[in-house]
């Protein structure tokens, strides 16, 4: 488990983040990692979450949790700077987040998915990325307030989950920074 219990609690406790309660530089956005099987991918996502200032990470199902040498190798210490919490049942975590007022934005390729750049991202929210092969669990898709996808133009129909996470995380950061005054901009 995380060596900093106060940061774990910060990721899971209390109302959805707001500009008034977030530490400086943090976004009113979380991410839920649903059954990510590679600890290296999880470590990379911790590092990216730190870089963009996500409010915290929720690790669900079989997703690797710190401390683990393979996770820490790619996280480069970000497990100590990004608040996180582990939920054995990612769908239960999503229900709790929605009950606390967070919109659930799922990154997945479905017929109903909206192009990620055209989507109107709500704040505060939690975005969800899923298993490297099977994607986001159906139980999470049914809870989604919005499903977005990154269009693919090559022969391969998907990106590595940590790459997709990074693209979406920076997109979330840009959208937050472009909000008009009074709606959360800088």
Where are these regions (language model features)?
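Post-transcriptional modification and biogenesis factors for structured RNAs
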Residues: 1-186
């Amino acid at each position: 488990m995380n060596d900093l219990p106060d940061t774990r609690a910060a990721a899971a406790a209390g109302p959805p983040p707001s500009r008034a309660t977030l530490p400086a530089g943090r976004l009113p956005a979380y991410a839920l990692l649903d059954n990510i099987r590679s600890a290296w991918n999880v470590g990379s996502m911790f590092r990216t979450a730190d870089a963009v200032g996500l409010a915290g990470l929720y690790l669900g199902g079989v997703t690797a949790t710190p401390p683990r040498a393979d996770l820490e190798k790619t996280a480069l210490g970000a497990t100590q700077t990004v608040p996180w919490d582990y939920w054995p049942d990612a769908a239960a975590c999503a229900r709790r987040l929605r009950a606390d007022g967070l919109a659930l934005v799922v990154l997945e390729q479905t017929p109903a998915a909206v192009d990620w750049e055209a989507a109107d991202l709500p704040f505060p929210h939690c975005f969800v990325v899923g298993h490297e092969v099977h994607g986001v669990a159906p139980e999470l898709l049914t809870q989604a307030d919005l499903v977005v996808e990154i269009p693919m133009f090559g022969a391969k129909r998907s990106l590595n989950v940590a790459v997709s996470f990074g693209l979406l995380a920076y997109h979330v950061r840009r959208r937050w920074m472009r909000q008009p005054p009074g709606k959360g901009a800088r």
